[in-house]
A protein has these predicted regions:
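Proteins enriched for Cys/Gly/acidic motifs involved in redox and nucleic-acid/cofactor modification
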Residues: 1-157
Length: 157
């Protein structure tokens, strides 16, 4: 399968999309740089602000409109607004943060060798042409601030 990856939001989303790219490549999928060439588009969404929520919906709709690809949505918008995200892309194409690691298994294994098991940290050098890698230090939050969606979208830290 040819898969295009995009994200809205923070550096954590960027780190996760790069890890997702590595996981998909390990399963024999092809990551493409042109969404028009993709069979699937995966969007890692954000909802930390109302604008981020709107941007997430806008990006998803644009790919639905402008490509022939199936659009999968994951990330904070999907976690915080599960029903709306499922209505936007379909329930089977909507993955909350808790289910994000299951996305690569959704695709059949392609022509990839079985991965070797190395016992060291492999930096996620994704398709974003960055010279730096990200290491996830924390995810989520243990507080219950009334004005913040982080706990809902990301869960406990």
């Amino acid at each position: 399968m040819k898969i295009y990856l995009d994200m809205v939001g923070c550096r954590l989303n960027q780190s996760e999309i790069e890890k997702l790219a590595l996981d998909l490549l390990a399963r024999g999928q092809e990551i493409v740089t042109d969404p028009a060439a993709a069979d699937y588009v995966i969007v890692n969404t954000c909802c930390v602000t109302a604008k981020a929520c709107a941007d997430s919906r806008k990006v998803i709709r644009r790919y639905q409109r402008e490509t022939g690809a199936q659009v999968l949505a994951t990330g904070c918008y999907v976690s915080a607004f599960t029903r709306q995200a499922a209505e936007l892309v379909g329930e089977d194409l909507s993955f909350p943060n808790a289910d994000k690691d299951a996305i690569p298994q959704r695709f059949p294994r392609g022509n990839a060798a079985e991965p070797l098991d190395f016992n060291f940290l492999k930096p996620a050098l994704g398709a974003r042409s960055r010279t730096r890698s990200f290491i996830k230090v924390q995810e989520g939050c243990d507080n219950y601030c009334t004005y913040c969606l982080t706990r809902i979208a990301r869960g406990k830290s």
